Amino acid sequence: MPISYCVSAKKASVVVESVVGNFTGHENVNLIVARGNRIDVQLVSPEGLKNVCEIPIYGQVLTIALVKCKRDKRHSLIVVTEKWHMAILAYRDGKVVTRAAGCIADPTGRATDNLFSLTIHRNGLIAIRAFEGSVKMIQWESGTDLRHFNVRFDYPNVSDFKFVDTGEDDVYRVAFIYDDDHGKHLQFSDLNMHDKEFRTYSRQASIAADSSVLIPVPHAIGGVIVLGSNSVLYKPNDNLGEVVPYTCSLLENTTFTCHGIVDASGERFLLSDTDGRLLMLLLNVTESQSGYTVKEMRIDYLGETSIADSINYIDNGVVFVGSRLGDSQLIRLMTEPNGGSYSVILETYSNIGPIRDMVMVESDGQPQLVTCTGADKDGSLRVIRNGIGIDELASVDLAGVVGIFPIRLDSNADNYVIVSLSDETHVLQITGEELEDVKLLEINTDLPTIFASTLFGPNDSGIILQATEKQIRLMSSSGLSKFWEPTNGEIISKVSVNAANGQIVLAARDTVYLLTCIVDEMGALDIQLTAEKKFENEIACLDLSNEGDDPNNKATFLVLAFWSTFAMEVIQLPDLITVCHTDLPTKIIPRSIIATCIEEVHYLLVAFGDGALVYYVFDIKTGTHGEPKKSNVGTRPPSLHRVRNKNRQHLFVCSDRPVIIFSASKKLVFSNVNVKLVDTVCSLSSSAYRDCLVISDGNSMVFGTVDDIQKIHVRSIPMGESVLRIAYQKSTSTYGVCSNRTESKAERVFASKNALVTSQSRPKVASTRADMDESPPNTTSSFMVLDQNTFQVLHSHEFGPWETALSCISGQFTNDSSTYYVVGTGLIYPDETETKIGRIVVFEVDDVERSKLRRVHELVVRGSPLAIRILNGKLVAAINSSIRLFEWTTDKELRLECSSFNHVIALDLKVMNEEVAVADVMRSVSLLSYRMLEGNFEEVAKDWNSQWMVTCEFITAESILGGEAHLNLFTVEVDKTRPITDDGRYVLEPTGYWYLGELPKVMTRSTLVIQPEDSIIQYSQPIMFGTNQGTIGMIVQIDDKWKKFLIAIEKAIADSVKNCMHIEHSSYRTFVFQKRAEPPSGFVDGDLVESILDMDRSVAMDILSKVSDKGWDPSLPRDPVEILKVIEDLARMH
């Protein structure tokens, strides 16, 4: 049975929590950010934030906090995970060490429904309210396990719980908000450490009913601030001080999301709310003999940020805004307003979580993932591609460019660019960042340039070579020149040059000429014909190279391909003797050829007119090569170019699917480039544009830098509202998007309001809730049609009050050539637990005028269509507790054909062939089969375990991957070896259990990376998933023969790497559902396996040498170097 290999293609980007303190040194200021299962530590410097380290955490981080005991000069970091593991970390000698660790779970306790709170006393005592009826007090000493005890705490409906700073180490006073039958109250209680019980100190009864957040104010001011939706209250630490209330227009119906202290004295606090407003709360404090007294408060508006979940004042007016729903930001507070705002964004950190839905689309021949991300004003679509990015520095509008050649004339940096058009040549002088069209020496600008370069460089060269279809020109900055033309006047078609040594090879129809450029001691120029050879066929492309493809050494051989014989030859220099003749594996004309060497491996690469590329491993000693390997790099004739980046040579494939080819572990890697089209390219390193590329798409030239490595690239399309579902329609090149728009007091740009055309509709039924229709909500649900390339909203269709778009697909029905969008909606009233009325609406986009959206049909259903799919040209829908199948009639109407009712609530469904996988809110997954002849569903198999499902996906027609609400993944398979149950069903037998640590929201059968043909280890059935934390993960099936091999590697790494939480890897990945626990099985932790690639090689080799090979397939590698190559191949899949 295959094993599931699970790995993160893009790690979590949601900010769980962030803190600022002195972690890496008592004089260092650090920003520490928790994301998913890792913590990033950054150093605050005058140049900005610098990465110090990344701390992997065995668990989903629930919260982090800083603590500094009296004898400590720097802070320690408290980490609590979702499974109630806790650790206290410190940074010593450049490493993260664990000072104390332990499990704080209460085996008999029930987790609180509405509040998890961690608060720290000034002397280091930690209080955690996580379980009903008690507060856990944690004492610790460095190098020991955590010691904790419970204190009884029976107050109902607690909103917040915090230690109060009294200025005394032995006074343990807490403040908390709770509500009972008499209203909401604020209470101060002191903890008696001897009796381990709380004793009431004071109580402020009947505070504002909307009070929910406590902010402790540092001593010497002391006390707490209470935040509500319409008011703020300050309560002093003692019973004698006056309570200070405050309200203003800025507080009207405000829901605060987080707060952060500005001054150590506690006179200023930053506040953020659900509208993304950044507010400053100021305490007006007076000092007297009896201490400090708060006289009044004031709130000022500073500007708008992402909806913040964590806010930290760093220093000098710089603030970090961490967000779960939008991009995190680094902002600066200003003393003077700019456009009504006192803040300016310095840097934005992309966040693609929470992911609500996603769809895989092929655009320009490259797969890309489009996700529904974020919520409310920070809702957006994110376009995600895997490849190498080019960051644009400058661009020049210049159409028709066919060649670009850098020139370094009497300079240590490139100072000219020769640009060839289809009928002429331009010389552009580079002065700083400016380009000027100039005349240079005797360069022929009346004809297109085939090749141009400086010779005998690389620096301070005064000699330029230009090749046109008529002649070769050699020119000196001293004014001397020398021209060479074919004796028979034939047209020069192809040229290749070894510039450092003055070697030129050119093709004129069927003849190859080898030329040598010479400069004598007096500076005179000469071009000598070294050799020529006539072939039987016309030459299509050629290239000069040598051993190592070193541009500083003389070329020793030539490789060329022919037009009509579809053959390739390797020719020895200087006598032009053929040493290798090869028939190419296709009858398409070769258009470009290169002989290169990367990582000491020689390759011959040939690109063909249909966009195919074939490459061979070439043995330069014997003149032989291996079997051809093929890759598609576009749909038009590609051209191959050598480019340099960071002092390393790569190959750039210019096409309508541009690719950069580099090597990893002596294997070629084809990485997509994040531009749509490249006609030609060159490397450039001028004074202003160092180590960059110049590319042309036929309309403009772009100067840009290249990413160091292949990575995920994210493009953001702000929507200004929550985007819930997305579908792609290839026939109209559009996306269909379901969204929810919430009206706000602030000015907002809503995508659904900016459509070219709008329309609206309501269900054609009498409302079941006339009372609710009288007070419609401030939220409107829409279905939008967006252009695939520009993401312009072409049409927005608004649904009725209380009606929410829940699902959408694009598809075709049987006997109908049209492609439709189908949208499922539900009338969701806030006081109803289950939707009673919904509808399925069928839309058609006009092929010509795509802003026209026609409502073809609508069907009222009893419930919410939570998921819809196309099944053999029919529509299958999960509607509350039923699965319904509708056929499409010739009258363009949906007609119910059959139903399945054995569900609580069907949240998701997937289709493969005639099979339907159903994810139920409580009853795990079941497998239905549509019997076409009988016209009904048959429940083929069922998982009898209780799982609270979120989503599912087919692995094969008889195996299913499930994601459930307790952050777990599992796999099940139809077990046909066991007897069928009494009611005629098989059992879906569990084959894998795994704790993911994040909520898997959506799964789809797809991949961003095409599997390399030369991979040692092959995989199948790729499934991508998106989580609430913004992780994009990938699960693939790997053949059973690799199972013990991968498990052994996983165990060896887990045993060798000490995790800061001091728990076993198997404990971390244990599947936990309520009181049930299942050891991890059927999955391999790809993140852990591939972490060895980030280790020092000596450390990695030592770990891999300890891998146990017991029970392995004999054909599998055992040498650590070969095992590492397998892991590198696994990393190439994403």
Swiss-Prot record:
It is found in: Cytoplasm; Nucleus. Expressed at high levels in the spermatheca of adult hermaphrodites. The keyword Lyase does not apply. GO terms for biological process: DNA repair; proteasome-mediated ubiquitin-dependent protein catabolic process; protein ubiquitination. Pathway: Protein modification; protein ubiquitination. Its main location: cytoplasm. GO terms for cellular component: cytoplasm; nucleus; site of double-strand break. It comes from the Eukaryota. One of its GO terms (molecular function) is DNA binding. Pfam families: Beta-prop_RSE1_1st (PF10433), Beta-prop_RSE1_2nd (PF23726), CPSF_A (PF03178). Keywords: Cell cycle, Cytoplasm, DNA damage, DNA repair, DNA-binding, Nucleus, Ubl conjugation pathway. Belongs to the DDB1 family. Interacts with cdt-1 and cul-4. Plays a role in DNA repair. May be a component of an E3 ubiquitin-protein ligase which promotes histone ubiquitination in response to UV irradiation. Histone ubiquitination may be important for subsequent DNA repair. Promotes the degradation of the replication licensing factor cdt-1 during S-phase, thereby preventing rereplication of DNA during a single round of cell division. This is DNA damage-binding protein 1. It comes from Caenorhabditis elegans.
